[in-house]
Regions:
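HIT superfamily nucleotide-processing domains
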Residues: 1-229
């Protein structure tokens, strides 16, 4: 555990943080799903209005690549729990991405604790796929197996332990891009999705009170988790 880490604090402090930033937020949604080693929680600063969650290991690691295969079934359990609430009929696209941070000093991301972004949307799958492919294919994206959680196993096989990377998934099609020259822009996929879907991109590092109000309205659209019923 790192005392200065946003995600090492645990479920209680995560819930308190939601309460401090968003007084009208239903705190039953703050911990969407929890198991022994992982927490699923809403992204506190969602860049779009569709359901936007983070899957976070409780132990302090800097990427999902560093997790042993013994955790992969637990990861799949969280994804299944999200699907049951947010996509029970399979009509929405499920988008996942991660900025995997393994090298010291690389500014790929601002939070040095692994977190997998999970988004559910009815926005056109073809447009999302086209835009992502257009932006990342020049970086030699590597396809991973479709079945879960085997794509996590393949992630370990395709990457060296100290590789930084981008992981992107839509509808169980998974791609990984190695960062060969420390060139990934900060918040790359967050900016891309907001721009593509027509949402105002709000940089969580600089959000003012009015922008926090907008983010709070986006958060309030999230349905209650199964544990709240």
């Amino acid at each position: 555990m790192h005392n200065d880490c946003l995600f090492c604090a645990g479920a209680t402090e995560l819930t308190e943080r939601f309460s401090n930033y968003y007084p009208n937020f239903d705190l039953r949604k703050a911990i969407f799903y929890q198991t022994d080693n992982f927490i699923t929680t809403p992204d506190m600063y969602p860049v779009i209005g569709d359901p936007y969650l983070l899957l976070v290991p409780k132990m302090h690691v800097t990427s999902f690549r560093k997790l042993s295969s013994g955790y992969h079934q637990e990861i799949a359990k969280h994804l299944s729990a999200m699907d049951k609430v947010l996509n029970p009929c399979g009509e929405y696209a499920r988008i996942m991405f991660e900025h995997g941070q393994n090298k010291d000093g690389n500014q790929t991301k601002s939070v040095y604790h692994a977190h997998l972004h999970v988004v559910y949307t009815n926005f056109c799958r073809r447009k999302i796929s086209y835009r992502v492919m257009k932006d990342i294919l020049s970086w030699d994206a590597i396809p991973l197996p479709m079945h879960e959680p085997s794509f996590m196993t393949a992630l370990k096989e395709q990457l060296e332990v100290d590789d930084d990377y981008l992981l992107f998934s839509i509808d169980k099609v998974h791609l990984v891009v190695k960062d060969q020259c420390h060139s990934f822009p900060s918040q790359f996929f967050r900016v891309l999705l907001a721009d593509l879907m027509g949402f105002q991109f709000i940089n969580w590092k600089q959000a003012n009170q009015w922008q926090l109000h907008i983010l709070g309205e986006r958060l309030n659209r999230l349905p209650l988790p199964l544990t709240a019923n």
